[in-house]
C-alpha cells in the first residue's frame, strides 16, 4: 500500500470518496464525491447527472439510506449535476456559497438551497468542518477544514495530477493564487480533492502549483516583450501541443493571466491586442 493510501486509510471509516466517471465529451475524466462521517453523514458534491443512479445507490449503501447534510464546493456541472437528484432522494437541501447558489439556480431554479459562507461550521457527530472561502476557480468556491486532523475537503482548489482551470469570466487568477497561499498557510497534512487521489504532500503540491503559475506569467511576458500579440497568438506559442479543438481552452487560460497582468498594470489589453507597458 502506498504512503498516500496509508494516510487516507487512517480516515477511511469517516471519509469515503467515490469516483464518478465523466461523459465522453467532458474535459475532466472523472470527479470525486465525498462522504464524511460514520452516522450522521454529510455529502460533498454530486457528480455528473448522467451517473445519477450510481451516485444515489452509493450514498444509500454507505449511509444506510440517511444523509444529514449535502454541501456543494462550487457550481461547475461535474460537481453539481446531481444536486436535484440528491436533494429529492434524501430529502435534504443543498448548502453552498450564495454566489454559487445563484449560478446553479440559473440552470435549475427549483432546487432548495441554504446559503453558507466563510467560517460556517459543518457538524457531523464529533467532526467539525469549517468552511474556508477559496475563490478563483469559481467565484464562490468553498473548501472545508477539519482543523484537529489538518485535513481539507478541497473541491477543485488543489488537484492531484493536474492544474486547476482558471478561466474568465468566472475564474480569477489573482484570487486563485491568494486562495492557494491561504491554504498553504493553514498547513494541511492531507487534502481530499475534487479530482484525483488524496494529496498527502500538500505543502509540496501547493508550492509546485504556485511555481507553475509564476512560470506561465513569465512566459506570457516574454512573448509580449518580443511582439504585441493577440490571446490566440500567445496561446499557440505557449501551448504548442494543443489540438485545434483544444485551443479555445488554452486561449481562456491565457486570458486569465492577461487579466491579472493588466490589473497589476504590467500590460495593456485593448482591441484584442496585448502589449507590455
What are the residue ranges of the model-derived segments?
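Active-site HxH/HxHxD metal-binding segment of metal-dependent hydrolases
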Residues: 25, 48-125
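A short catalytic or substrate-binding loop motif that flags glycine-/basic-rich loops and adjacent residues
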Residues: 26-29, 114-116, 135-138
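C-terminal regulatory/interaction regions
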Residues: 223-277
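Glycine-rich phosphate-binding loop signature in dinucleotide/nucleotide-binding domains
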Residues: 62-65, 122-127, 147-148, 185-186, ...
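Conserved beta-strand hairpin/beta-sheet module of binuclear metal-dependent hydrolase folds
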Residues: 4-63, 142-160
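Aromatic/hydrophobic pocket-lining residues that form the small-molecule binding cavity
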Residues: 80, 176, 180, 254
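Metallo-beta-lactamase
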Residues: 41, 48-50, 128-219
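Short Pro/Gly-enriched beta-strand edge/turn motifs at strand-loop
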Residues: 13-21, 102-104, 125-127
Amino acid at each position: 500500500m502506498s504512503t498516500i493510501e496509508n494516510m487516507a486509510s487512517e480516515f477511511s471509516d469517516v471519509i469515503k470518496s467515490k469516483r464518478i466517471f465523466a461523459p465522453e465529451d467532458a474535459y475532466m475524466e472523472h470527479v470525486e464525491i465525498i462522504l464524511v462521517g460514520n452516522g450522521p453523514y454529510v455529502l460533498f458534491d454530486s457528480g455528473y447527472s448522467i451517473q445519477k443512479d450510481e451516485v444515489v445507490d452509493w450514498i444509500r449503501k454507505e449511509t444506510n439510506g440517511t444523509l444529514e447534510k449535502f454541501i456543494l464546493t462550487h457550481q461547475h456541472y461535474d460537481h453539481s449535476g446531481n444536486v436535484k437528484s440528491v436533494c429529492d432522494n434524501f430529502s435534504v437541501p443543498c448548502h453552498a456559497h450564495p454566489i454559487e447558489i445563484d449560478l446553479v439556480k440559473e440552470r435549475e431554479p427549483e432546487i432548495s438551497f441554504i446559503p453558507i459562507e466563510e467560517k460556517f461550521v459543518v457538524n457531523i457527530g464529533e467532526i467539525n468542518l469549517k468552511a474556508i472561502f477559496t475563490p478563483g476557480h469559481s467565484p464562490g468556491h468553498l473548501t472545508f477544514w477539519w482543523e484537529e486532523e489538518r485535513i481539507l475537503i478541497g473541491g477543485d482548489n488543489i488537484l492531484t495530477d493536474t492544474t486547476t482551470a482558471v478561466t474568465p469570466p468566472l475564474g480569477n487568477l489573482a484570487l486563485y493564487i491568494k486562495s492557494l497561499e491561504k491554504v498553504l498557510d493553514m498547513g494541511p497534512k492531507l487534502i481530499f480533492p475534487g479530482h484525483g487521489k488524496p494529496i498527502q504532500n500538500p505543502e509540496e503540491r501547493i508550492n509546485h502549483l504556485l511555481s507553475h503559475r509564476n512560470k506561465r506569467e513569465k512566459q506570457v511576458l516574454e512573448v509580449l516583450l518580443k511582439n504585441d500579440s493577440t490571446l490566440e497568438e500567445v496561446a499557440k506559442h505557449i501551448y504548442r501541443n494543443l489540438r485545434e479543438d483544444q485551443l479555445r481552452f488554452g486561449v481562456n487560460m491565457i486570458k486569465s493571466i492577461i487579466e491579472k497582468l493588466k490589473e497589476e498594470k504590467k500590460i495593456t489589453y485593448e482591441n484584442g491586442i496585448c502589449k507590455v507597458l
